[in-house]
């Protein structure tokens, strides 16, 4: 979990990315990302202006040189222009290369800090804060939307700034040669650099606003398709899901096509304005030459300078589209950064207790963000060292919410939660999770070896310790029978293992971590009844003497625990030993009767 430790906020500090409400606009917050790197961006702007200025200077000087050379003056008279032409030609390439190097290096460093900030925010939000978020959409925000932020700098702000500088210089130089030509160039550059982008921006606005969300939808469809191919095939739903992915792709293609139409419109209008401006300046130049106010050599400069000047504004229509695109991507990124945290880390954490015992919940209530009803209410629970408690109830009773509160994945909104007499909310989340561990029903197995999956729990564990954990999880005989033993690959999400083997490997990992308190959240879920009951019995045997909270909706094996707590709609409706509760009228007995009837039906 991110956010713990003194360096947790360093990426946010470097990038200027902060969570929470902000008085800045979305694009204002993107600009704030520059932070201490504004000097390097100013250097990139200067280099970009010099590159464009060199292009204009090259065209103007070349025009003057060719026109003057046609008069066959002494060669030495042309040497300054020849040298300037060479300097502008070399400078154009050198300044452009330097501008790209400085701007991209600076912007990519900002993106790296931003991506780290987003990832750390996701760590703080997970798992309770991401309950309604799709994985594909999260991936799109973390990768594509963060990447899109670079376009604000390298395809909008820096090009627009360089275009403004070079346009002003070109207009000033042309007006110095011929005022009316300078005025015509000013009108043309204003039309191409501001008017055309406004038109194309209006045309593309709706498409650009929909582009990032549509990209997220496609990513979600593809992620679901790739991760659930086997299940979709078995259920016969693969064609429908494939069609949904194709439809999302077609929608994204149509949106991109509309944006491309606006780009083409902008290119065409810019070329038209450029041609008209050059024609007008040529007309004014011809009149000035006829009137004797302008030399024929200067006439070439008056005509060619506007032609080169339009290179500065040629990309402005596309730049405006990128600005619109960045705005929507930035909104999606800041939706993550501004999302309320389900857990608040203490500003000044308390010292960790020597022992977490007794672990005590008193009058505890918890609610997920956006819900109007408590998922847990008025819950009391005390765990002494070695005590084992089973929490049972139907789906939605609040069992998993209890697990999340115990691990501080979700903070209680009422009541108290203490570890060894210390308020858990005054401890860092990582400290709580060193005392309380989880073996979840959907524990993730990485696409690596059995050994590497176990070493996640304790990096320096010896071979003997790994084998001991596997033995306690009743998995050692299976591992010893594998050709590669501990180095056997498990496959993605443990695909090469059976359901029971995956759960046992997850249990072995939790046992290896040696948590003082171990929470087993529906460890036998998704298994057939005989396998589930056998696994539950083995889990209880493996945790003998360890403080354990077993969360389950199955009752098999619960006579081995010290207390059974029955939840319904987030409240405790019955508690006591299994032997006491199963013989009296109440929710547990009703559950036992339904379970027995289900087993009889299954055998039949």
Q: Which residues does each PLM region occupy?
A:
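Helix-loop-helix
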Residues: 63-84, 173-187, 262-331
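Short cytosolic helices in intracellular loops of multi-pass membrane proteins
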Residues: 108-128, 135-139, 143, 209-251, ...
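ABC ATPase nucleotide-binding domain helical subdomain, centered on the C-loop/LSGGQ "ABC signature"
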Residues: 416, 451-491, 537, 545, ...
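C-terminal portion of ABC ATPase nucleotide-binding domains
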Residues: 1-20, 24-28, 537, 545, ...
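An intracellular "coupling" helix at the cytosolic face of ABC transporter transmembrane type-1 domains
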Residues: 30-39, 127, 131, 144-153, ...
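Transmembrane helices of ABC transporter permease
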Residues: 44-50, 158-210, 283-294, 311
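Helix-to-loop junction immediately C-terminal to a conserved catalytic motif
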Residues: 407
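ABC transporter TMD-NBD coupling linker
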Residues: 306-370, 411-414, 418, 461-469, ...
């Amino acid at each position: 979990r991110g956010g713990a430790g003194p360096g947790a906020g360093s990426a946010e500090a470097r990038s200027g990315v902060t969570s929470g409400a902000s008085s800045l606009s979305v694009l204002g917050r993107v600009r704030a990302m520059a932070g201490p790197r504004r000097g390097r961006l100013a250097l990139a702007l200067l280099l970009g202006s010099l590159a464009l200025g060199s292009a204009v200077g090259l065209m103007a000087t070349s025009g003057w040189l060719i026109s003057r050379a046609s008069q066959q003056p002494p060669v030495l008279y042309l040497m300054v222009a020849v040298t300037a032409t060479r300097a502008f030609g070399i400078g154009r390439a050198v300044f452009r290369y330097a501008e790209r190097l400085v701007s991209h290096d600076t912007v990519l460093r900002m993106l790296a800090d931003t991506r780290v900030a987003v990832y750390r925010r996701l760590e703080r939000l997970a798992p309770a804060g991401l309950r309604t978020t799709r994985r594909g959409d999260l991936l799109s925000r973390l990768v594509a939307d963060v990447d899109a932020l670079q376009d604000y700098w390298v395809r909008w702000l820096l090009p627009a700034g360089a275009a403004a500088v070079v346009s002003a210089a070109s207009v000033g130089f042309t007006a110095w040669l011929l005022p009316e030509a300078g005025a015509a160039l000013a009108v043309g550059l204003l039309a191409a650099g501001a008017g055309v982008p406004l038109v194309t921006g209006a045309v593309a606005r709706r498409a650009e606003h929909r582009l990032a969300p549509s990209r997220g939808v496609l990513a979600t469809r593809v992620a679901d398709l790739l991760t659930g191919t086997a299940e979709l095939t078995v259920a016969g739903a693969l064609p429908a899901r494939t069609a949904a992915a194709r439809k999302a792709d077609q929608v994204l293609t149509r949106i991109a096509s509309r944006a491309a139409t606006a780009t083409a419109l902008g290119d065409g209008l810019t070329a038209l304005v450029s041609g008209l401006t050059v024609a007008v300046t040529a007309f004014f130049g011809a009149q000035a030459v006829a009137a004797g106010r302008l030399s024929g050599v200067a006439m070439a400069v008056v005509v060619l300078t506007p032609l080169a000047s339009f290179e500065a504004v040629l990309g402005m229509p596309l730049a405006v589209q990128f600005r619109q695109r960045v705005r929507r991507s930035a909104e999606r990124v800041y939706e993550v950064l501004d999302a309320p945290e389900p857990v608040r880390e203490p500003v000044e954490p308390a010292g960790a207790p020597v022992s977490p015992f007794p672990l005590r919940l008193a009058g505890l209530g918890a609610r997920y963000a956006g819900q109007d009803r408590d998922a847990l209410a008025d819950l009391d629970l005390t765990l002494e060292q070695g005590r084992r408690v089973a929490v049972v109830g139907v789906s939605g009773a609040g069992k998993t919410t209890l697990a999340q509160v115990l691990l501080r994945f979700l903070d209680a909104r009422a009541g108290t939660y203490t570890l060894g007499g210390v308020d858990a909310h005054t401890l860092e989340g990582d400290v709580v999770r060193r005392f309380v561990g989880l073996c979840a029903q959907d524990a993730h197995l990485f696409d690596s070896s059995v050994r590497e999956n176990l070493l996640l729990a304790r990096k320096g564990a010896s071979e003997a310790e790994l084998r001991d954990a596997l033995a306690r999880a009743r998995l050692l005989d299976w591992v010893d029978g594998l050709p590669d033993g501990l180095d056997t690959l498990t496959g993605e999400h443990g695909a090469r293992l059976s359901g029971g083997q995956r759960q046992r490997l997850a249990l072995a990992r939790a046992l290896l971590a040696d948590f003082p308190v171990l929470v087993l959240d529906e460890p036998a879920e998704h298994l057939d009844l005989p396998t589930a009951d056998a696994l539950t019995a083995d889990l209880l045997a493996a945790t003998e003497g360890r403080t354990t909270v077993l969360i389950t909706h199955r009752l098999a094996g619960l006579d081995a625990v010290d207390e059974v707590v029955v939840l319904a709609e987030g409240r405790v409706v019955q508690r006591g030993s299994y032997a006491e509760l199963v013989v009296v009228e109440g929710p547990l007995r009703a559950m036992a009767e339904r379970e027995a009837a289900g087993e009889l039906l299954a055998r039949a």
